[in-house]
Amino acid sequence: MRVMEMRKNCQHLWKWGTMLLGMLMICSAAEDLWVTVYYGVPVWKEATTTLFCASEAKAYKTEVHNVWAKHACVPTDPNPQEVLLENVTENFNMWKNNMVEQMHEDIISLWDQSLKPCVKLTPLCVTLNCTDANLNGTNVTSSSGGTMMENGEIKNCSFQVTTSRRDKTQKKYALFYKLDVVPIEKGNISPKNNTSNNTSYGNYTLIHCNSSVITQACPKVSFEPIPIHYCTPAGFAILKCNDKKFNGTGPCKNVSTVQCTHGIRPVVSTQLLLNGSLAEEEVVIRSENFTDNVKTIIVQLNASVQINCTRPNNNTRKSITKGPGRVIYATGQIIGDIRKAHCNLSRAQWNNTLKQVVTKLREQFDNKTIVFTSSSGGDPEIVLHSFNCGGEFFYCNTTQLFNSTWNSTEGSNNTGGNDTITLPCRIKQIVNMWQEVGKAMYAPPISGQIKCISNITGLLLTRDGGEDTTNTTEIFRLGGGNMRDNWRSELYKYKVVRIEPLGVAPTRAKRRVVQREKRAVGTIGAMFLGFLGAAGSTMGAGSITLTVQARHLLSGIVQQQNNLLRAIEAQQHLLQLTVWGIKQLQARVLAVERYLRDQQLLGIWGCSGKLICTTTVPWNASWSNKSLNMIWNNMTWMQWEREIDNYTGIIYNLLEESQNQQEKNEQELLELDKWANLWNWFDITQWLWYIRIFIMIVGGLVGLKIVFAVLSIVNRVRQGYSPLSFQTHLPAPRGPDRPEGIEGEGGERDRDRSGGAVNGFLTLIWDDLWTLCSFSYHRLRDLLLIVVRIVELLGRRGWEALKYWWNLLQYWSQELKNSAVSLLNTTAIAVAEGTDRIIEVAQRILRAFLHIPRRIRQGLERALL
């Protein structure tokens, strides 16, 4: 019984042991994943970088110094590439776009730089004795459009100017527009001179003299806006949204990538956007927040409205010298037509445009009544439509454009027709600089008539606010003044991204490297020592931080380049570099920095020159537990990058540590390289070394043989023995019953042999070598026989063990099978018995129901009886 109990316990132990072994085999069969580095993956991240310009500046009046291009932009690409990104959805935000800020700063720098060498008007900030210019004597043409210039619109002023001799002044005369001078004190001329007209006189000064530094634009400066393409340096790209109804914010499903934007004309204007891009389908309105009346509404039209502006009168320009090389240009006289400057546009086109704008505004503001009205007041640049036309700055009244009410059906006071709308304009020569406070520019008069044709492509609207939520009317006015909105109307569909070509993902492939145990070394502290922190360490300790030093070295190079760029930017007025020149230099240096950084990381990870690089870093499921099929077949690189974005720093550090350990292992392996591969022993380059060793061994053996022979002879001589010859036969002693032999060479000879002593040195060497080889052969043969015997025993034992395990596996398989069959039989019997019981109960219940009528009949019979 005791034996049977022990046998049962052993059987249970074998059963559980087999189950554990199977579980271990299943767990060990699970495949391991390893980090693989990929270079050139299509991944990007939002970034801000230095953009540079491309333009065909030489095609626009090469003899004129253009403010915008300055001939420093690179030529445009004749075949620009635009790559459509399929199945890509990207978020855009035109109101938080660094490209707008960068363009704004660039235009400011260009204005400042173009005016830097020009003449300051400080000597003209004196008292001007002005009267109304007499315009009655001019010839008036009968051309249509425009109104007569009002009396007093132009002032004839006299002032004192210092000549080339500083102690001598000279009186000069010049014509100034009424908007450019402000009165100091004003009165009427004395009655004795009041015989011809009611001309007023007074003391004036130039506007902005007390608050700004006025600079005269250089004579050959041209303000004609030419298309400027903003481009990204290498390593960056521009994403472009091609959705035709894109409102400026939110996701865009039709995305492409370009290297440069389209040609953007930096038109400085208010209220109306001129010569911009058009919407492809319907009118589009954009605002950062439509419910906030402070936010400007940018309207992009789908069809342009042509506006023709002109200054009819023919002005002459006179020069006033105030010193050597310093000349001030002013209006000498007005010849010919004395009508006001004005702009004409088609009423039908404008009304059709307003109708489409109203439709979009109603969609946004719940079908309310839309009222367009004039500006509520402010600076002339805001109240009037200001822009540059042929070098003169026009300020036009747009009340006729925005003076209508649109109810739910049609505009109430919107007059139709095909007539022309004429906007009266005034000209200012002293313009308050829009980009900075405290600066103003004097635009010298342009001689001759001025005409310019522009296209209205957009509007800048502001909405009146109010707390009355029940109001059914929304009032809109033309606005502007913030030039960022002008640039934003063109850059709304672009965003700059930084290309991240390095990607990591799990694969089944593992780098084949030297396998050694990782030793615990104190590298954590050294990682934070910095670039020069390991200078006082030993060479062994310093080699651990080589990657840290390489990284800090590159950071030092980048820092030096940034310092150089800042120095150049600070001294660009001495180096004569334009803002575009600075940006091109920054862009090119930035591209080199990006490339060096990527190559540095690849080198640190041991992946230089590889597009796909396997590593020995195991993939951690905590980074992403998705399967390989899910990752490689269902996710894009952008989605995968977002998945592991929080762990890329950890992965990079592990890759660096793994490569450091691998390099250390390889260094230790090189020290044992001669013993690493037995096949190298047969390398022909080692034969001379082998021959030399062989000669040394043979020489040593022969020398030992000679030494021992001499010592033996000396020992025998000392014992009184004198050898007759080296060939003397020394037979072994025999017994009396073993004769030496019989005649005829019969009989048995002794086994002992006495070989004759060899003659000569070479014969002696050969004899020793033969003895050595024979000894080595016999020993190797014995060793081989022992090894064969051991292998045979191991094989027999192994085969017996395999047969034992196989029989055990068969036994337990049969036991499991029998147990399963027994369990199934028991279950089947229990189910069958239960089913029989259920069927029997159901039959009894059914019989009871069937016997109810019989029981009723029997009861009635008993009752009747």
Curated annotation (Swiss-Prot):
Coiled coil: 642-676
Keyword Transmembrane found: yes
Transmembrane segments: 694-714
Biased composition (Basic and acidic residues): 735-754
PTM (free text): Highly glycosylated by host. The high number of glycan on the protein is reffered to as 'glycan shield' because it contributes to hide protein sequence from adaptive immune system. Palmitoylation of the transmembrane protein and of Env polyprotein (prior to its proteolytic cleavage) is essential for their association with host cell membrane lipid rafts. Palmitoylation is therefore required for envelope trafficking to classical lipid rafts, but not for viral replication.
Record's signal peptide: 1-31
Region (MPER): 671-692
Pfam families recorded: GP120 (PF00516), GP41 (PF00517)
Region (V4): 396-425
GO terms under cellular component: host cell endosome membrane; host cell plasma membrane; membrane; viral envelope; virion membrane
Topology feature Cytoplasmic, residues: 715-865
Motif Di-leucine internalization motif positions after renumbering to this chain: 864-865
Positions of region (CD4-binding loop): 375-385
UniProt keywords, alphabetically: AIDS, Apoptosis, Clathrin-mediated endocytosis of virus by host, Cleavage on pair of basic residues, Coiled coil, Disulfide bond, Fusion of virus membrane with host endosomal membrane, Fusion of virus membrane with host membrane, Glycoprotein, Host cell membrane, Host endosome, Host membrane, Host-virus interaction, Lipoprotein, Membrane, Palmitate, Signal, Transmembrane, Transmembrane helix, Viral attachment to host cell, Viral envelope protein, Viral immunoevasion, Viral penetration into host cytoplasm, Virion, Virus endocytosis by host, Virus entry into host cell
Region entry V3, spans: 309-342
Annotated stretches, region: Disordered: 728-754
Region (Fusion peptide): 520-541
Alphabetical list of InterPro entries matching this protein: Gp120_core_sf, Gp160, GP41-like, HIV1_Gp120
GO molecular function: structural molecule activity
Cysteine pairs bridged by disulfides in the record: C53-C73, C118-C218, C125-C209, C130-C157, C231-C260, C241-C252, C309-C343, C389-C452, C396-C425, C607-C613
Sequence motif YXXL motif, residues: 721-724
Protein name, UniProt field: Envelope glycoprotein gp160
Organism, as annotated: Human immunodeficiency virus type 1 group M subtype B (isolate RF/HAT3) (HIV-1)
